[in-house]
A protein has these predicted regions:
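Outer-membrane beta-barrel porins/channels
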Residues: 25, 32-474
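Surface-exposed strand-loop-strand hairpins of Gram-negative outer-membrane beta-barrel proteins
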Residues: 3-20
Length: 474
């Protein structure tokens, strides 16, 4: 059983986000039975927190004329979904004399189909600041600076059911069924200083759901007289079934805006399949006082499979309704362009100066999942974009983790204390820098292209974790 504290080393407290959070991380047990003179069969259950989302992100920088509402306006100027934008018109599903009609982004000037790249922020912008109240004309407004804060909370809980065994203390086999439980929440506020006004966006988001995966592995001692061992394992994708819900608001002091305030909420059910993971490990024990280990893992994040729930059927045998899904091919192609394979290296050592005391050291390196210039693409014709309520993103870099720990044994009772420090840098962008959403202003000889770029803002995710583990051997 393990628990402790997670402390964020940088950032400013915001909303319900805290820099120090208590965390219950693990509880489990193993039942072992002898199947031969030197062979055993083990049955285990383990709960552990696979991901802790508690984090506060703060960023502020100059914008030099670019703005989030300019991104929406530029997409509208492109005029059609095929060009990466949309055609803005009053809601065509309602009577023309209905004064409650909102502005919608359509796939073409004559279509009644909503463009899939007309996201929730585009909707809010065109029904407030991007539309002039007096004339109904559309405009974009420049900004000089931004301020951004987001508080993340929640976790992914892993419930692992394991069967393992060994053959003559030479070959060790194991298989694990993992059940995942997703609880993610975030709340963000984003403000821009316009030329003569201010604008703010608030977004509350929640993702819940579940998933499962399977892991199988083998460890072999090739030389009977040696403690040296070689291991290999493979982990299937985690097959997630998720629901994203949001409530997003906009407010501006721009006097020409169609409305000073707007709000939208949506729910999106989808499936998300993570990459396969492959690993190899080496280990060796020197006497009864020193243990050394090294592990290498590889996951290709460019193979992430985002899927659209597109129907379903009733399974009469199991008496339940089953959803069907298909790949979101446009989003998955974009994933291949911006993400890459991730390598993880784990090194560890344990030294016992006396029989019941252990000193442990560890180091982890995780390479970045993002290509150097990888970013969101708000022009994609994808349901993932249509339901998006966040324009910002962080291109996170490599992770370095350092661990030190002490373990003490009193008869059958074990006490372990550990400290881990994790450091990661990243580039924050309030919206995407994409030439495809640059637009032309003016006519004839005065025409010019006006890009909507934001400079990277350096951010960090540095955290310390203090962990206490208690164990008992029956």
């Amino acid at each position: 059983m393990s628990g402790g504290l997670v402390v964020q080393g940088n950032g400013t407290a915001f909303s319900n986000g805290k820099k120090t959070n208590a965390s219950f991380d693990q509880i489990g047990g193993v039942y072992s039975m002898r199947t031969g003179r030197t062979s055993y069969l083990n049955f285990g259950f383990n709960y552990h927190k696979g991901r802790n989302f508690d984090y506060i992100l703060n960023a502020a920088n100059a914008l030099n004329g670019s703005s989030l509402n300019n991104q929406s306006y530029a997409k509208g100027e492109l005029g059609s979904e095929g060009k990466g934008g949309y055609y803005v018109d009053l809601d065509r599903s309602k009577p023309q004399n209905d004064k409650r009609r909102d502005f919608i982004g359509y796939s073409t000037p004559t279509s009644t189909d909503n463009a899939l790249n007309f996201d929730q922020l585009d909707y809010l912008n065109f029904n407030t600041i991007n539309t002039e109240k007096a004339t109904g004309n559309h405009y974009g407004y420049n900004a000089s600076a931004f301020d951004f804060n987001r508080a993340y909370t929640g976790y992914i809980g892993n419930y692992d059911f394991n069967v393992s065994g060994n053959l003559n203390n030479r070959v060790y086999l194991g298989i694990t069924l993992g059940i995942k439980d997703v609880h993610y929440k975030s709340y963000s506020e984003y403000f821009e200083q316009l030329d003569n006004a201010q604008i703010g966006y608030a977004n509350e988001k929640e993702i819940t759901g579940n998933g499962f995966d399977i892991t199988a592995g083998i460890i072999v001692r090739p030389v009977e007289s040696s403690a040296f061992r070689i291991g290999a394992y493979v982990k299937s994708p985690t097959w997630y079934d998720l629901r994203a819900e949001n409530n997003t608001q906009i407010e501006t002091t721009e006097a020409r805006a169609l409305n000073p305030f707007g709000e939208i909420g949506n729910t999106y059910d989808y499936k998300f399949f993570t990459p396969w993971k492959f690993g190899i490990s080496l280990g060796h024990t020197v006497g009864n006082y020193l243990a050394l280990g090294a592990t290498y893992e590889y996951e290709d994040y460019s193979t992430i499979n985002s899927r659209i729930n597109d129907g379903g059927y009733y399974d009469w045998y199991y008496d339940e309704y089953r959803e069907t899904s298909s790949p979101d091919r446009i989003m998955n192609n974009h994933t291949k362009q911006v993400l890459r394979g991730v390598s993880t290296l784990k090194l560890g050592a344990e030294y016992k100066p006396v029989e019941n005391l252990a000193i442990r050291l560890g180091y982890n390196y995780v390479s970045s999942a993002y290509k150097e210039n990888g970013q969101k693409d708000p022009t994609l014709s994808s349901l993932g974009n249509a339901y998006s309520s966040e324009a910002d993103f962080v291109n996170w870099k490599d992770i370095n983790r350092f661990t030190v720990g002490l373990g003490y044994q009193i008869k059958k009772f074990n006490i372990d204390l550990a400290y881990q420090y994790s450091a990661q840098k990243g580039d924050f962008y309030p919206f995407s820098n994409l030439p495809a959403i640059s637009y032309t202003t003016g006519t004839g000889a005065t025409a010019k292209t006006t890009p909507n770029f934001a400079s990277a803002t350096k951010v960090e995710n540095n955290r310390s974790q203090f962990l206490l583990t208690l164990g008992y051997q029956f």
